[in-house]
């Protein structure tokens, strides 16, 4: 069949055609469960509509040329505290002014507040959100395809917002940048981007081995944050998806955060080979693969979940950084994070991936950030590891070992909790009690690429001073100092030290730590 010409039709299944033409005065509607795949060209002179709801999204894939505007009735979360949605336009050449006019006329579906529309941009240079208003929307131009926006529908409405534009049928790019290179908190590494196609996009290697978002863009993302960060719309923050997740597919127009590794602008790619008609919810993920294991711990205040951290085990992974499997937390001051066992550069991880051989033989530092005087508890949420593995939470200040398999760890801290060095997760086949003399002692040193200082942490857990020496590669001593144990984390300036590769040596009692540092 060379060409399919349709007058009036409703598609609630998968339709494939070589070419598709919708004639003037005719209607073609794709139900939320339907999809259209065109190997040739698409032309619309009539009315072509794609529908969706909260967890089902129709799609169209065009391999050839595409002409004529179509409509995508896209579901968007309602306005409300900690709700809203992150959305990009699933169509090209969509006027923002026309969009807000169409969705606030008659029975309005786009939320408003006075002169402000519930559509806005994120600026990572200043870490701010700005909504369009009646006075600014006229000059807003078109939605930047591939860019994400904050958006919300009216409370109690249908949740459907209509986008009118053309089908993108070629590879799309979107600029990203790291505006927090010096960790100054003036800007952020996070960029809000979106699936630019009116079809699903393969997100990770479990969805497609090579034609997926994370694999194609791996060299553009920060190695410690090589993941898709999806907004939860419930006040809990962001859920992280990477190659440790099941098959990930991104819905049409779905927006999400990614972390750039470059202080200069760089372009991410959404290739046509990533497109697929297969999917489901906004961020749809299949089950964790059978040859991998996971343990998820959650922190609660009463019955309210505050945060979680995930440990993932798979053959071939290391105790150091595994880009695409390990993933740093979106908020580096989060309530619960873990640290790498090797190559620890001070990043708090929400997903800590390691080899399968470590399931019964690992001690992982965790970071708990909590205010003094507030009860909290930590317990096992998902136990997807060996049945005989004991999970202990060590508190080396209280001298306790809590077996999480049997009950939660509970604490009302007398002082503010922060930084690494006090709490550890033990995965072991052994059995401990509080009478056993088990005290894990973290002593770590690192220099972040863009910092002008060396960070030493774990000092408060040392019995006395820690001696620090820095050597050049030829053995010449560059620096020598002693740090007390009154403050857990301390820094040493590198502003007067030349760029190069050095060796740093820490000695605390009988314990010696030697590590290579690169000073830029």
What are these model-predicted stretches?
Residues 84, 90, 99-153:
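Conserved positions within compact, well-structured domain cores
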Residues 17-30, 69, 73-84, 89, ...:
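Boundary/junction segments of secreted and surface-exposed precursor proteins
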Residues 53-100, 177-190, 195-198:
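Extracellular, surface-exposed repeat architectures
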Residues 1-23, 433-435, 491:
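Bacterial Sec-dependent N-terminal signal peptides
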Residues 18-79, 164-166:
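Extracellular beta-helix/beta-solenoid repeat scaffolds
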Residues 23-27, 31-33, 39, 83, ...:
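Tight coil/turn sites that cap or link beta-strands
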Residues 125-144, 148, 152-488, 495-499, ...:
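Compositionally biased Ser/Thr/Gly- and acidic/asparagine-rich
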């Amino acid at each position: 069949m060379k060409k399919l010409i349709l007058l009036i039709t409703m598609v609630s299944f998968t339709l494939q055609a070589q070419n598709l033409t919708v004639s003037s005065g005719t209607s073609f509607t794709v139900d939320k469960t339907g999809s259209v795949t065109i190997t040739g060209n698409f032309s619309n002179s009539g009315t072509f509509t794609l529908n969706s709801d909260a967890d089902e999204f129709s799609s169209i894939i065009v391999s050839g040329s595409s002409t004529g505007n179509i409509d995508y009735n896209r579901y968007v979360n309602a306005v409300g505290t900690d709700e809203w949605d992150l959305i990009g336009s699933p169509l090209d050449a969509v006027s923002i002014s026309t969009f807000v006019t169409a969705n606030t006329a008659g029975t309005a579906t786009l939320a408003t507040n006075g002169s402000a529309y519930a559509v806005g941009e994120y600026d990572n240079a200043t870490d701010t959100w700005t909504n369009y208003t009646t006075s600014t929307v006229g000059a807003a131009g078109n939605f930047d395809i591939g860019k994400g926006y904050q958006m919300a529908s009216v409370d109690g409405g249908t949740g459907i917002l209509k986008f009118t534009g053309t089908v993108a049928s070629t590879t799309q790019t979107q600029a990203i940048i790291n505006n927090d290179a010096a960790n100054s908190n003036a800007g952020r590494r996070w960029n809000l981007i979106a699936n630019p196609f009116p079809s699903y996009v393969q997100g990770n290697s479990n969805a497609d081995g090579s034609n997926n978002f994370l694999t194609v863009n791996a060299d553009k993302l920060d190695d410690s944050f090589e993941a898709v960060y999806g907004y939860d719309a419930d006040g809990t923050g962001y859920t992280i998806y990477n190659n440790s997740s099941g098959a990930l597919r991104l819905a049409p127009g779905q927006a999400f955060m990614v972390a750039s590794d470059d202080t200069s602008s760089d372009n991410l790619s959404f290739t046509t080979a990533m497109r697929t008609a297969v999917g489901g919810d906004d961020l749809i993920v299949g089950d964790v693969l059978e040859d991998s294991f996971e343990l998820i711990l959650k922190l609660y205040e009463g019955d309210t979940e505050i945060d979680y951290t995930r440990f993932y085990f798979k053959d071939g992974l290391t105790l150091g950084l595994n880009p695409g499997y390990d993933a740093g937390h979106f908020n580096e001051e989060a309530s619960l994070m873990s640290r790498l066992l090797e190559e620890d550069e001070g990043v708090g991880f929400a997903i800590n991936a390691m080899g399968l051989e470590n399931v019964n033989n690992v001690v992982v530092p965790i970071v708990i950030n909590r205010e003094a005087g507030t009860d909290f508890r930590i317990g096992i949420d998902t136990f997807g590891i060996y049945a005989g593995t004991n999970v202990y939470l060590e508190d080396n200040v209280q001298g306790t070992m809590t077996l999480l398999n049997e009950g939660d760890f509970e604490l009302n801290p007398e002082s503010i909790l922060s930084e690494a060095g006090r709490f550890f997760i033990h995965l072991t086949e052994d059995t401990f009690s509080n009478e056993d003399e088990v005290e894990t002692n973290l002593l770590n040193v690192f220099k972040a690429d863009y910092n002008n200082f060396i960070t030493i942490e774990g000092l408060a857990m040392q019995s006395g001073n820690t001696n620090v020496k820095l050597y050049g590669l030829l053995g010449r001593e560059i620096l020598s100092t002693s740090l007390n144990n009154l403050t857990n984390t301390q820094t040493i300036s590198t502003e007067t030290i030349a760029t190069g590769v050095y060796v740093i040596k820490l000695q605390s009692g009988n314990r010696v730590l030697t590590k290579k540092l690169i000073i830029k």
